Amino acid sequence: MKKKFVAIMMVAAMAASMAACGSDGGSSDTQKGGSSTTTSDVANKDKPLVWFNRQPSNSSTGELDTTALNYNKDTYYVGFDANQGAELQGEMVKEYIEKNNDTIDRNGDGVIGYVLAIGDIGHNDSIARTRGVRKALGTGVDKSGEIDSAPAGTNSDGKAAEVQDGKITVNGKDYVVRELASQEMKNSAGATWDAATAGNAIGTWSSSFGESIDVVVSNNDGMGMSMFNAWSKDNKVPTFGYDANSDAVAAIAEGYGGTISQHADVQAYLTLRVLRNALDGVDIDTGIGTEDDAGNVLSDDVYVYKDDERSYYALNVAVTADNYKDFTDSTVVWAPVSKQLDSGKHPTKKVWLNIYNASDNFLSSTYQPLLQKYDDLLNLDVEYIGGDGQTESNITNRLGNPSQYDAFAINMVKTDNAASYTALLNQ
């Protein structure tokens, strides 16, 4: 304790000496050459901010919230390429059907029936994944120039307005592809992407459709695994999810059809890296597309940056029986960006970060463990806040004093609600 006290006194003395010396030039919020912002130097509204996992947007139209994405000069979004991943999931399901055409039609009626668990009808990623599956299987219908992503309810007769019957031809044989049922998995408290609701839904669907269900598709692995464990596994029905959660990847050996890795290892790195760069006052591409002083750099086949959207997107990879052993641990950091930053050049800074739902399987079991590994490598002292998945106030009420933080990483409950957070920073 004595050594620690002496060290603190020395730092204080040095700071006082530097302040007395003054400076030749004008002050600025961020400085070059390894210096960084401090909480006392910068107004909360000017501090680095990254939105992640849930892109600020209109939940009805999907239109990006450009005000939130351009909140200040150090604001960015980090997620994954939703459309690329969605199309990949759809193609993965289609290819599985084509490769297993001899056994996929369980009741031999010539109709490949599938059920679909939709995460959140107002979430861009959920919308994209629903569209991706319907596009690949030919079951999508046009609505205002886009594939309709609304739940079809029950559709045993193929007459639902939200979907149509598709067709797949394999070895000269035609199969009808029908979305037998789909619904948003929202629980009674309002939480979406709800695994328990999906588990209950597959019980209802299996009672109604029986052996007409040939494939189960889910917008994520949390819901997918709930349905797999509740029904699909015992009935040997291939189930497809999204996120490459460790339990889902392991379940591929037991009949889980496949999943999509959204490169959470790259996303988590980017989430904290853009903050680190802004705090250091260096080019935003440092340690991303350009090698940093520790040797960290990402190759352009694992991410894209869209300047007009101020958004970094990780690219997706299909995980199937052919390659699942390469993805068994979803919490391993991405090797090309695993080098420790020098604390002398990149001093510790404090970050406030929230997870919209502490019970979300992907965010809690994959994303946050990765963040916690990267925060050490990037010398960031991160305070993690877990929400209830239902209300923004459950999270915003715990951001009582933004002034004690150097930067913010925000994962909203609803994509429309960016203003709930920026209002706090504007005070």
Model feature map: region roles:
Residues C21-Q427:
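A residue-level marker of the well-folded mature domains of exported/periplasmic proteins
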Residues K4-D24:
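Sec-dependent N-terminal signal peptides of Gram-positive bacterial secreted proteins and lipoproteins
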